[in-house]
A protein has these predicted regions:
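Short basic helix-loop element that most often maps to the first helix and adjoining turn
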Residues: 3-4, 31-50
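Amphipathic, hydrophobic secondary-structure cores in small proteins
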Residues: 62-67, 73-77, 93-94
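N-terminal flexible/basic segments that precede or flank functional cores
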Residues: 1-28, 97-154
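Recognition helix of helix-turn-helix/homeodomain-like DNA-binding domains
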Residues: 51-69
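DNA major-groove recognition helix of helix-turn-helix/homeodomain DNA-binding modules
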Residues: 72-88
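Short C-terminal boundary/hinge segments that cap the last helix of small helical domains
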Residues: 83-99
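Helix-turn-helix/winged-helix DNA-binding modules
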Residues: 28, 39, 67-70
Length: 154
């Protein structure tokens, strides 16, 4: 195993750990700023004073967050004003290996079926079980080698 694979494995561990830690977490419908503020029993005016902004700015922030129209800096400032910390992550729905396996299978299926179409033109089609075996074999090889074009296409 090369250095590149070791480093990739370390990154996978970090992402898998974050995915596990956030598995049951969902963004509240009102957004985190309003939810935490209400949990603390803090008024919008009080948060505005702590953030050194207007009440209107807090209202705007609380309406923008659920729509995804807020900056990380604004969330950070609100979190600090409420005595909290901002945590953000991009995590897959499951393990990183699952994403890699799924991509390898899609890519392998496209490659094997394209080859099958060419073979059919020469009247040399494979049985469905042989096609499945070829897809599985190709997917394993793609997941292992992860060529430069791995994430391109299917």
């Amino acid at each position: 195993m090369g250095v590149k694979q070791v480093v990739q494995g370390q990154y996978q561990t970090i992402v898998d750990r974050a995915a596990g830690a956030t598995a049951g977490l969902a963004v509240p419908s009102e957004g985190w700023v309003r939810t935490v503020r209400k949990a603390l029993g803090m008024s919008g005016a009080q948060l505005a004073r702590r953030m050194q902004v207007t009440r209107g700015a807090v209202n705007q922030l609380e309406h923008a967050e659920p729509n995804g129209a807020v900056t990380l800096n604004a969330l950070q400032k609100a979190a600090e004003a409420m005595g909290c910390r901002l945590v953000y992550a991009i995590v897959p729905p499951g393990a990183v290996d699952t994403l890699i396996h799924d991509q390898a299978e899609r890519k392998a299926r496209a490659l094997v079926l394209a080859a099958g179409r060419h073979m059919a033109l020469e009247d040399q089609t494979l049985a469905p079980d042989r096609i499945k075996a070829q897809i599985d074999l190709q997917a394993q090889e793609l997941a292992r080698a992860m060529p430069a074009d791995f994430w391109d296409g299917p």
